[in-house]
């Protein structure tokens, strides 16, 4: 997923996003929350997506520019290629991938969601400090 993200950004004349262990952790915790609550939502279990960024220590300063992409699929619909293609076809998700961010955290978790076993949940958390973001 990271390679596809960096490739898409490169084609758009943008730089690669830095790895962020904190955003990786927040993305992992968010995907786990989606599966635990059986709720595919940016507010799974009643928590805003920024909750997990705060828990991971990413939003420790006053001003951040952040975004979240979330997807799920079963079988071939849960592959990296399938999910990335869907994100790039969605204006909101594409905006995050090509957005003015400096860091990326990713998670892929498998579990049961909405009665579907072996569901793959993908989470991408994007972030940058407001001083470096222009949007």
Feature-to-residue mapping (PLM):
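Short, well-ordered surface patches within globular domains
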Residues: 1-54, 58, 100-105, 109-111
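Short, solvent-exposed mixed-charge patches
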Residues: 134-135
């Amino acid at each position: 997923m990271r390679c596809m993200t960096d490739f898409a950004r490169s084609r758009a004349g943008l730089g690669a996003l830095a790895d962020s262990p904190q955003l990786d952790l927040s993305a992992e915790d968010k995907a786990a929350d989606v599966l635990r609550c059986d709720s595919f939502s940016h507010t799974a279990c009643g928590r805003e997506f920024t909750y997990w960024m705060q828990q991971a220590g990413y939003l420790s300063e006053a001003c951040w520019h952040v975004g979240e992409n979330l997807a799920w699929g079963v079988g071939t619909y849960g592959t990296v290629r399938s999910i990335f293609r869907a994100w790039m076809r969605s204006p909101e998700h594409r905006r995050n991938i090509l957005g003015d961010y400096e860091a990326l955290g990713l998670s892929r978790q498998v579990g049961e969601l909405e009665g579907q076993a072996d569901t793959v949940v993908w989470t991408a958390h994007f972030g940058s400090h407001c001083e470096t973001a222009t949007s």
